[in-house]
Amino acid sequence: MRVCWLVRQDCWHQRIKLPHLEAVVIGRSPETKITDKKCSRQQVQLKAECNKRYVNVKQMGVNPTSIDEVVIGKDREMKLLPGQVLHMVNELYPYMVEFEEVAESPNVTQRKRKRPDCDSQEMEAEAGASPSQCSVSPKTGKHGAAKEESLGHWSQGLKISMKDPKMQVYKDDQVVVIKDKYPKARHHWLVLPWASISSLKVVTSEHLELLKHMHAVGEKVIADFTGSSKLRFRLGYHAIPSMSHVHLHVISQDFDSPCLKNKKHWNSFNTEYFLESQAVIKMVQEAGRVTVKDGTCELLKLPLRCHECQQLLPSIPQLKEHLRKHWGG
């Protein structure tokens, strides 16, 4: 028998059971520990199709619920597949689904828990991708064997970006580098491994050399494409990515981009929500895994603060105007 769990990604202990074909309504409640009043008490209705391994999500609240950054829409429905990320409201409170095989006998019940489909190879072009119903033949590598993909586990925009020579800036047998589809700065690339690794949560010491290679490739791209530019760069990971598959951000620190539109965008790169690449490598080297603190998603709500001089700014337009003073624009 197969059962389905809804698993909060920024609070590792939280799991909500979704019985087969039963409508479950969740939102702001003690069960989810969501207290944000922008999240309705009846934000979404979830109905698990355990046999087919997906969950039907209906947005009931007024404020937007999204799957892999695609907004569902009030009273509309979308399928949530293993490997995809459901944000309960306003791109906050990330959840994923896990399916678990439960083998029953007269005297004992054994459970075999499945990972949330790391093999879906769902990656990010950093926003606005549409769900795909196409399958793609994945590459394999020593850092993770890729299995046959299930239908619809890729976001169409990313698949196109990864295969599109115009988006690719570098590739080798371990990684591909693409331009971020919605760059948050003048220069913004994503370094993505071909190996199927769903998130930092599943990274182990086995992936250490891959992480080092990703960092080295990121530095190579900076050198190759910016030359003698005086722009500063940071290389790092979002603690809780908006879409599934490990990816390293390589981003210039000017943040001069029309795609930088809101507080979440800013704070995802300018608080501890952004994990430095070298810090992640050191963590894996010393502890064998990456630890993300509970409540990390709350960092996205912090006031806007200039990353250069720490001045508080009331809005994104005023922050952008302020930043021009630092880079002389």
From Swiss-Prot:
The record marks 161, 238, 249, 264 as: Interaction with DNA substrate. PROSITE patterns: HIT_1, HIT_2, ZINC_FINGER_C2H2_1, ZINC_FINGER_C2H2_2. It comes from Rattus norvegicus. A zinc finger (C2H2-type) spans 304-326. InterPro entries: FHA_2, Histidine_triad_CS, HIT-like, HIT-like_sf, SMAD_FHA_dom_sf, Znf-C2HE, Znf_C2H2_type. Its EC number is 3.6.1.71, 3.6.1.72. It is an enzyme of class 3 (hydrolase). Interacts with single-strand break repair proteins XRCC1, XRCC4, ADPRT/PARP1 and p53/TP53. Interacts with NCL. Interacts (via FHA-like domain) with MDC1 (phosphorylated). Residues 155-260 form the HIT domain. The histidine triad, also called HIT motif, forms part of the binding loop for the alpha-phosphate of purine mononucleotide. The FHA-like domain mediates interaction with NCL; XRCC1 and XRCC4. A motif (Histidine triad motif) lies at residues 245-249. One of its GO terms (molecular function) is mismatched DNA binding. Residues 106-149 are annotated as: Disordered. It catalyses: a 5'-end adenosine-5'-diphospho-5'-2'-deoxyribonucleoside-DNA + H2O = a 5'-end 5'-phospho-2'-deoxyribonucleoside-DNA + AMP + 2 H(+); a 5'-end adenosine-5'-diphospho-5'-ribonucleoside-2'-deoxyribonucleotide-DNA + H2O = a 5'-end 5'-phospho-ribonucleoside-2'-deoxyribonucleotide-DNA + AMP + 2 H(+); a 3'-end 2'-deoxyribonucleotide-3'-diphospho-5'-guanosine-DNA + H2O = a 3'-end 2'-deoxyribonucleotide 3'-phosphate-DNA + GMP + 2 H(+). Its main location: nucleus. Residues 180-184, 242-243 are annotated as: Interaction with DNA substrate. A motif (Nuclear localization signal) lies at residues 111-115. This is Aprataxin. The gene is Aptx. It comes from the Eukaryota. Residues 23-72 form the FHA-like domain. Residues 1-95 are annotated as: Interactions with ADPRT/PARP1 and NCL. The active site is at residue 247. GO terms for biological process: regulation of protein stability; single strand break repair.
